[in-house]
A protein has these predicted regions:
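Conserved G1/Walker A P-loop phosphate-binding module
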Residues: 1-162, 175, 216, 220
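S4-like RNA-binding module at protein N-termini
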Residues: 48-49, 57, 385-387, 391-392
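C-terminal-of-GTPase-core extension/linker across diverse P-loop GTPases
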Residues: 2-7, 12, 18, 153-390, ...
Length: 400
């Protein structure tokens, strides 16, 4: 399961975002829907289920389906708070960077209203530019990667003087513990014009440009423009968007209020919906709070933006699609009769054999062929899967 880190400075709503995103209580298989550890929790990728399209009543086992909407568990990490100088170990810098080693992508929660300074101290709304926060996080990550590469750089460059590929391998070895792939490094080298140039000729500026590209590829980031209901957040949101960064407007506080109300059975609300329904007797303060959320957030922005941020990160940044493996292509069920039991998130471009390995190593090792259940067609190992495919894996080895 891929892991997305939620980052941000103090007082921007980072922990509120994390709490709201991970508090939905739904019974799914054997997943522990408490916090995995003090700073890792389960959120959900929300997608339209194929059950209604295929005219079946599903019985999910690794996810949940609510009125034709499939919620698939994903992992979020509440990364230690960040202050300038983290790359040098200031504050919780070392903890922050250690957390980030594991992350496949980031959600950077920023105070779009500009009501906190660079250190997270409360100030007059509009007196701080949230783009400064975005740049400082990017800068700290770049310096962190740069420092890792610079350590032993002389040795790396000398030992690969006559063998460029050896240099690439050594760079990958230095960064492999950070969930950075060799392919990411090669893409970054190509983008910076350093391909096949002797490493001994690379300047520190070359290295800095290289790590910037690596960071964009290996730690792609969605900006969650939080406190969107406060002025001048909408203007700052547009300003951030104009830089070409991936940005979603949100109100983490509004989402947390709605999820808590739904948890107490006061309202009916599914994360990401543009509406909620009051189903219990409410006091005047509760009614007023919900009316404000509807007026200031949902009616204006379509939703609170928290679920949209999660979905955008996993679907657009990480390039994941949803596939439904089954054991019987006619009944669309597993051996216990559960219809559309599992929904898996896999990388766009993945093959039938990739899916087999994701389900279980034994299935992958014994892979013979797969069946596209929609079309009733037999497909081979290299068949590229599409979003919402329903697939049966036929293997010489049983699933363990």
């Amino acid at each position: 399961m891929m892991l997305v880190g939620v980052v941000g400075k103090t007082n921007v709503g980072k922990s509120t975002f994390f709490s709201a995103a991970t508090m939905l209580n739904v019974p799914i298989g054997n997943y522990p829907f408490t916090t995995i550890n003090p700073n890792v929790g389960l959120a959900y990728f929300k997608t339209k289920c194929v059950c209604k399209e295929l005219g079946v009543q599903d019985h999910p086992t690794n996810s949940v389906c609510i009125n034709g909407i499939r919620l698939i568990p994903v992992k979020l990490m509440d990364v230690a708070g960040l202050v300038p100088g983290a790359s040098s170990g200031r504050g919780l810098g070392n903890k922050f960077l250690d957390d980030l080693r594991q992350a496949d992508a980031l959600i950077h929660v920023v105070d779009a209203s500009g009501s906190t300074d660079i250190e997270g101290r409360p100030i007059t709304p509009g007196s701080h530019d949230p783009l400064e926060d975005i740049r400082f996080v990017e800068n700290e990550l770049d310096l962190w990667l740069l420092n890792i590469l610079k350590n032993d750089w002389s040795k790396i460059s000398k030992s690969s003087e006559s063998n460029f590929d050896s240099g690439v391998i050594q760079i990958h070895q230095k960064l492999s513990g950070l969930s950075i792939l060799k392919a990411d490094i090669l893409t970054a080298i190509e983008a910076t014009g350093l391909m096949n140039k002797k490493l001994s000729t690379w300047t520190e500026q070359n290295l800095l440009e290289l790590v910037k590209h690596i960071r964009r590829i290996a730690k792609p980031t969605t900006i969650a423009a939080n406190k969107i209901d406060l002025s001048p957040a909408p203007l700052n949101f547009e300003k951030i968007k104009s830089t070409g960064r991936s940005c979603v407007p949100c109100s983490a506080e509004a989402e947390l209020v709605l999820r808590r109300a739904a948890d107490k059975k006061l309202i009916e609300y599914l994360p990401g919906d543009g509406y909620f329904k009051i189903v219990s007797q409410l006091g005047d303060p509760q009614k007023k709070a919900l009316e404000l959320i509807k007026e200031k957030v949902i009616d204006k922005w379509g939703s609170t933006g928290v679920q949209e941020t999660i979905n955008f990160t996993f679907k657009e940044l990480l390039g994941l699609i949803t596939v439904y493996p089954v054991e019987d292509e006619r009944t669309l069920s597993d051996k216990k009769g559960n219809v559309l039991p599992e929904a898996h998130l896999i990388k766009k471009g993945s093959t039938a054999k990739d899916l087999a390995y994701k389900i279980h190593t034994d299935l992958g090792e014994g892979f013979l062929y797969a069946i596209d259940a929609r079309k009733g067609l037999r497909v081979g190992a290299d068949h590229e899967l599409l979003d919402c495919d329903v697939i049966k894996i036929v293997s010489a080895k049983a699933r363990g």
